Amino acid sequence: MAVGITRRTLFGFRDVERKANIKNKQLIERASNDQERLIKELKSVGFWKGNTSKQEMKFNVVVGNPPYQEKKSSEKTVNNGAFASALYPHFIDLAANTSASYISLITPSRWMTRVGQGITNTWVDKMLQGNHFIKMHDYLNATECFDNVEIKGGINYFLFKPDYTGECQYTLHQNGNNITIDTYLDPINSGVVIRDSMAIRIINKVMAVEGNYFNGNNFVSMVSPKHYFDKGKLLSSNWTGYSKQKDENHNIKLYVNKKLEATGYGWIKESDVPKSHSTIPLHKIYIPKSGGSGTDAIVLGSPFYGEPNSVCSYTYLVIGYNAETHNFSQEECYNIIRYIKSRFFRYMVSIKKKTQDNPRDVFQFVPLQDFSKPWTDKELYGKYELDLFEREYIESLIKPME
């Protein structure tokens, strides 16, 4: 499929003889690994056999729908599924390196929140800090742009000028409504595109209380990295080496996917846990590492209390995992759970979470609280002085969580 899309990007839908051999020249692979020589070939007379001019091919404008991703079956996940690595960043770079005056492409929007295989921090920094985008139309739900096509994280098309530096005319398409503003894609230097203009307003109010909290002092510090207890196949999402009954040897509770075990847990020996043993005796919280669609009104899977002498499979993340900096009481854990279930918390997560997956980085815009007490939405709205319009906006998007 990627080859077909690449061919269409170069030639469009014209009914003409197509004289550049895309597959044999390995354009897709070379777009990521051999750009300098590839660009020389694309500009050469020999590549475009219909070009009778003796001069080098020049690109005034590059327009297209590049291939989005390529599955790499040689790289398996713990669930034995293939990784899908993003291709479109290489084609954006390729277009820019042709010295074209203007570039207009349609691509997934996952890069805006640094999500996905093949999306590097260096590349996102270059896109955001260059400020070369003149216009961008961004769809949170790809079906509003392409009927019956699901693209996690949404889709966008843009006008990019390599020698332009300035604000972007950014249009967000959401639930049939369009909002256009002139702005830099990262006006507060958070490292991501905050795609909701109301979110900028709310973040600014949180910043008035917490400072530049999103660059360090935020809920990310509470959440474990993926693969916290598991290693390889051991304690992976599909691992079934646990006992259904507790006994003298199998006395560590293992929380697993409920599709694997109806009760949601089994029992293992401490020696079955390959790493992170210091967290086992702690009070903690578990939350599914995947939850929601990225555009739904719940945002996250339901968190639950993790008692001492418990661990989890790859299905879950651990909140309060660090014995030195966390070490919460049971009461504090339940207060954290209440905070997670608040609409305010889940709205702040939704600013960055645009796919089903929720790695720890999606909690970047969630401020920390004093967890010696429970928090309600009313208290949180008051703490950050959210006005009635902002409160109603959050509650129009986020449903209550039981």
Regions from the PLM with identified roles:
Residues 1-136, 141-145, 158, 163-170:
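SAM-dependent methyltransferase catalytic region
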Residues 11, 392-395:
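Short loop/turn and capping residues at structural boundaries
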Residues 142-315, 319-391:
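C-terminal substrate-recognition regions of SAM-dependent nucleic acid methyltransferases
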Residues 394-402:
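Short, amphipathic C-terminal "tail helix"
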